[in-house]
């Protein structure tokens, strides 16, 4: 089985070290270096999101993890938007201590941070960005399976 790679717009492999470098840069620019201790992982091609923030509880506290879609060719501005989006979730959870903020965590507090970044830095962070999946595996939804089963009877 070939090793799957996540590529940037130039066709160069994107690594977790690249994500860490950008995280550190955006943390300094947009979050006053308040975020730390984040791990990175690649989302499965079966996953339906481009990014995911997880706050994993441990005996020593919360461990933050940011997942990035593997089946996307990342141009720099889209990768920045995705990482900052997930960093907002991290900020709300770790710094503000808020585990819940509306549906999928993109509620009032999330939108307030998006507005702050737009007003102060001209940065547009979308709640549901579309960065273009490649080789997306499409699986039938449950109702489609039931319908097909009924038709075959």
Question: What is each stretch, according to the model?
Answer:
Residues 81-94:
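Active-site recognition of the HExxH zinc-binding catalytic motif
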Residues 2-77, 94-153:
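Metalloprotease/metallohydrolase-associated module, dominated by Zn2+-dependent proteases
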């Amino acid at each position: 089985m070939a090793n799957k790679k996540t590529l940037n717009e130039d066709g160069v492999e994107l690594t977790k070290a690249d994500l860490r470098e950008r995280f550190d840069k955006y943390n300094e620019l947009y979050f006053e270096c308040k975020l730390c201790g984040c791990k990175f992982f690649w989302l499965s091609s079966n996953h339906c999101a481009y990014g995911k923030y997880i706050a994993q509880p441990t005996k020593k506290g919360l461990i933050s993890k940011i997942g990035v879609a593997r089946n996307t060719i990342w141009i720099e501005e889209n990768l920045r938007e995705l990482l900052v989006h997930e960093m907002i979730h991290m900020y709300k959870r770790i710094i503000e201590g808020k585990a819940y903020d509306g549906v999928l965590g993109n509620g009032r507090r999330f939108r307030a941070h998006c507005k702050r970044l737009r007003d102060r830095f001209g940065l547009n962070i979308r709640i549901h960005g579309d960065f273009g999946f490649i080789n997306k595996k499409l699986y039938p939804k449950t109702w489609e399976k039931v319908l097909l089963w009924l038709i075959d009877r």
